[in-house]
Amino acid sequence: MSSSASLSSSASLQRVVVLVGPTATGKSVLAVRLAQRFNAEVVNADSMQVYRGMDIGTAKLPPAERDGVAHHVLDVWPVTKTASVAEYQHLARAAIEEIGRRGRLPILVGGSGLYVRAAVDRLEFPGTDPAIRARLEAELAAHGPEALHARLARLDPQAAERILPTNGRRIVRALEVLQLGRPRFAAELPEYASVYDALFLGLDLATPELDDRVERRVAAMWQAGFVDEVRHLAEDCGLREGRTASRALGYRQVLTMLDGGCDEAEARRRTVDATKRFVRRQRSWFRPDPRIHWLDAADAALETAAARTIEGWMTSRS
């Protein structure tokens, strides 16, 4: 199918390709290649690539490596802003629909499971209570995320399984929802039902190979000047005050190093270990989704396999 393939269809729903999978599987590069084939544009679904200046540590593709493909919902928030999935949902859907109005195909790309679902699925967000939130955040500051995660595990094991014990922001949010008297946080995630006509593609590969990729990625981050990036964000952009960005993989560990909590070798080791744990969490999030067509990220013909799947999907809707 040529890049000028028509996106017209008898269906009224906007079409979107969703490309997901664990960190270090090559999603960003594949998305660019597919976008060139299918007259498409990329919409980011990585929760940390929305932050300006967080480039090396998030493996954000530099503009020169995007090969002229438009990317959306990148670099939209300062590192001091606390993440809002509801706000991200608004930005992502606006981008998807604007791309579609111009007759192009949106490709949503990322490994942040909740952001992916917020962008394309029937997902609504409970309200907030500033008093409850403030009390929980004070407990977080006093006792650390692991203590609150243990409480969440007692109250809602499903939610605790989906949230990293170090992710204080999401733990606080889950506990807040419970205290508001809403149904259990995990139970509020609806069945898999998209608001768009969506094709889901997933990339993964064998654990030993993925672990090796993670180690090589972290080594490349350090070689590319990651410590200097974190230092600049901390000294000039307020990274330490950012409740979300300061806890990102790698950034948290380097901030600890800069504050004298460990040496550089230990910060690097902790980054590798934390990233490998995160990969396991990503898999546990994406694997139950029956809509995902899984592809081998190590396949030399990966681009061809993905393109054929997209072509078949588009043909079935012509």
Curated annotation (Swiss-Prot):
One MF annotation (Gene Ontology) recorded for this entry: ATP binding
Interaction with substrate tRNA: annotated span: 46-49
Protein residues bound to ATP: 21-28
GO terms (BP aspect): tRNA modification
Residues with site note (Interaction with substrate tRNA): 112, 133
Binding site residues for substrate: 23-28
Pfam families named in the record: IPPT (PF01715)
CC cofactor: Mg(2+)
EC number: 2.5.1.75
Alphabetized UniProt keyword annotations: ATP-binding, Magnesium, Nucleotide-binding, Transferase, tRNA processing
Keyword Transcription regulation attached: no
Superkingdom to which the source organism belongs: Bacteria
Matching SUPFAM superfamilies: P-loop containing nucleoside triphosphate hydrolases (SSF52540)
InterPro entries found in the cross-reference section: Dimethylallyltransferase, IPT, P-loop_NTPase
Reactions catalysed according to its record: adenosine(37) in tRNA + dimethylallyl diphosphate = N(6)-dimethylallyladenosine(37) in tRNA + diphosphate
Self-association and partners: Monomer.
Function: Catalyzes the transfer of a dimethylallyl group onto the adenine at position 37 in tRNAs that read codons beginning with uridine, leading to the formation of N6-(dimethylallyl)adenosine (i(6)A).
Family membership: Belongs to the IPP transferase family.
Name the record gives this protein: tRNA dimethylallyltransferase
Source organism (scientific name): Acidothermus cellulolyticus (strain ATCC 43068 / DSM 8971 / 11B)
